[in-house]
Regions:
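Active-site helix of classical SDR
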Residues: 121, 157, 165
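C-terminal substrate-recognition "lid" of short-chain dehydrogenase/reductases
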Residues: 211-236, 241
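Conserved glycine-rich cofactor-binding loop
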Residues: 13-15
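Residue(s) in the substrate-gating loop at a strand-loop-helix junction
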Residues: 141
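Substrate-binding pocket helix/loop in short-chain dehydrogenase/reductase
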Residues: 97-98, 105-110, 200
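Short, small/polar-rich loop/turn modules that mediate ligand/substrate recognition or access, typified
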Residues: 173, 178, 229-231
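Alpha-helical segment proximal to the catalytic Tyr-Lys
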Residues: 126, 170-174
């Protein structure tokens, strides 16, 4: 039990984040999930993780608030003593044409999807440097690779995460810390349920939407299974970006 790896998954109560937490728990990690507001979903996820043998807990804090993040990381270290895996998954959408996009909708998405990666990764990377080991996986998107009309804020944030991933991978490699990103395509989650699925599926070579588990298995591979991959962005999109 003392050798179990400790993983922190932001936005881990539902959707892709929950699937990542479950996959890491199945692999033997003690998993801490962060959530923003849905306490019921978070508690349910923790129950599932504990049933898999994970010493899991849910922590409510705003990942875009540096002070709250640092307090949460300190609490994790006081209890778990280490952090081996970080999955920067927390994200929101505030879609709309750029001409009509409010400054608040722009800032909300940038703060939650991009700035949070700094606020969480900064203290966690210092812990990993002391451990001389660690794996960080950032949740990017195909929108950050080729852009998406109506998502200027989201595409900007995800493109920023890709640059962040590559730069940080170069900085931390000498400390045995790997940094990679996963770029999901259209995945069946609450964030995509209102999209015109038939039109989307027609553009996907595999002719279906992905499942959260498709992303989670890739995250688990990058976090735990490989030791010689860093600075990469792995597309999980059914062939949409070829």
């Amino acid at each position: 039990m003392e050798n179990k790896k400790v993983a922190l998954v932001t936005g881990g109560s539902r959707g892709i984040g929950k699937a990542c937490a479950v996959e890491l728990a199945k692999a033997g990690c003690d998993v801490i999930i962060n959530y923003a507001g849905n306490e019921e979903a978070a508690n349910k996820t923790v129950e599932e993780l504990k049933a898999l043998g994970s010493n899991s807990k849910a922590m409510k804090f705003d990942v875009s608030n540096q002070e709250l993040v640092e307090a949460a990381i300190k609490e994790i270290m006081d209890e778990y003593k280490r952090i081996d895996v970080l999955v920067n998954n927390a994200g929101i959408t505030r879609d709309g044409l750029f001409m009509r996009m409010s400054a608040q909708n722009w800032l909300d998405v940038i703060n939650t999807n991009l700035n949070s990666a700094y606020f969480v990764t900064n203290p966690v990377s210092k812990i990993m440097i002391k451990q001389r080991s660690g794996a960080i996986v950032n949740m990017a998107s195909i929108s950050g690779i080729y852009g998406n009309a109506g998502q200027a804020n989201y595409s900007t944030a995800k493109a920023g995460l890709i640059g962040f991933t590559k730069a940080l991978a170069k900085e931390l490699a000498s400390r045995n810390i790997r940094v990679n990103a996963v770029a999901p395509g259209f995945i069946q989650t609450d964030m995509t349920k209102n999209l015109p699925q038939e039109q989307i599926v027609d553009k996907i070579p595999l002719k279906r939407l992905g499942e959260p588990e498709d992303i989670a298995k890739t995250v688990k591979f990058l976090a735990l299974d490989t030791t010689y991959i860093t600075g990469q962005v792995i597309g999980v999109d059914g062939g949409l970006v070829i």
